[in-house]
Amino acid sequence: MTTPGPTPPREPAKAAPRQAGLLRSTAVFSSMTFVSRITGLVRDQVYAAVFGANPAMDAFLVAFRIPNFLRRLSAEGSFSMAFVPVLSEYKERRDHAEVKELVDRVTGTLLAVLLVLTAVAVLAAPWVIRVFAPGFDGNAEQVELAAQMLRITFPYLLFISLASLGGGVLNSYRRFAVPALSPVLLNVSMITAALALAPRMQQPVMALAWGVFAAGILQLAFHLPSLARLKLLPRPRWHGGH
């Protein structure tokens, strides 16, 4: 009489929910990316229709390019590459309280650095513009306009960096929708500023600078409810070790 062998593990049954979750996450991310691309295209069309190509628009593009460039270096560059693996390790090996403490300390340190950087950029705005746009040197009015807008747009770096930190936390917990949808808020804010605010301003292009500022606040605020549901809403604490 043959003795039945051990029952093989049911790997496919266990893998199925994981695979379904991965497909769902991919679909959500792809959909939000598509929406972001479409709203970005609409934004560019609105820019062309409302402002056209002129020195004032060039001044705005420089004033926005500076914090956007630094965002790619910090929030989406080396900082994220360093933080996300550490957070993942904490999730696997530490309890929730220690994960929360890590998020609080990283947020506090990032906030302190960004506040100093923002203060320096706001105070030295004309010099910063000359470094990033040396072609403006012969046009004092354009430098001044770009500097005025940089003082409004540069805090976007602070808001979006904190939002990206929150997005990294959410992604590590497989909450992909909010970080993926966040760029849409920037496009919608810019479109609204161009269509609704610009006609009411003495210097219409300044509306775009305020649109950037508002977008940063919206993108940061958009992440907070999801972080709160994970009980990881940051309470910034500065610590030299992180």
Spans of model-derived segments:
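Membrane-embedded alpha-helical bundles of multi-pass transporters/translocases
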Residues: 2-242
